[in-house]
Amino acid sequence: MDALGGLDLTVGAGEFVAVVGANGSGKSTLARLLGGLERPAGASFAVACGCDLLSEEGRMAARREVGVLFQNPENQLVAECVEDDVAFGLENLGWAPKAIRARVDEMLARFWLADLSRREPHLLSGGQKQRTALAGVLAVPRRVLVLDEPTAMLDPAGRAEVLDAVHGLRAAGLAVVYVTQEMDEVVGADRVVALEAGSAVYAGGVAGLFGDVALVQRLGLGLPAAGELALELATAGRPLTPLPLSLDELVAALGGER
């Protein structure tokens, strides 16, 4: 049985698309396919670079164009200090030392790591480790970034660090595919794709997904925290329409009742 089938996903430059679904729905398989880390079992499967992932050449091309960040940053940290880890991919590609230094400094600044440049990875917090891994992935210029539940092992502060960093990449024109089971992380997406048994059962706006209560329940997704609070208020006789999905929307909706 194929893990994915009949899935058509288009993500534009600067666009943030969230991918959600229950365990086993195909989210991680999609992330690995997009990054050229697995070979599709069936028909042609192409990514932003136009490469066909059925061929080894196509998968190698995808790995150059598509950066992938996974749950556990320690699996992607390979050097003895932060700046050496960020430089690792560039050194393997044969970049000139001056170009490497400039690019590493750029990445350290972008991901708020300059003060930690000589720090050993095992001394970093979870959020700092994930930002270091992200800087290393993107030190090599990419067109697409795929993140597979990158905050799953982080505390709330670490999650906020990583989300702020990822959302900041949109302004740079990077296409972002963000796999998550945290519904609060979906709220800031441009679009959301919901998977079930390897197929997309919803693709569209965030409000449209969470407005379909039956589908959300069937997929076992839950709602963002603000939406859950709004449902409790509705049960208590204070319905809010449309359903607020963020804290700001909830506060605005409650203020509008006065």
Predicted regions and their residues:
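The feature captures the beta-strand-to-loop junction immediately N-terminal to the Walker
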Residues: 20-22
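Catalytic Walker B motif of ABC-type/P-loop ATPase nucleotide-binding domains
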Residues: 145-148
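Helix-to-loop junction immediately C-terminal to a conserved catalytic motif
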Residues: 35
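ABC ATPase NBD Q-loop/coupling interface
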Residues: 44-61
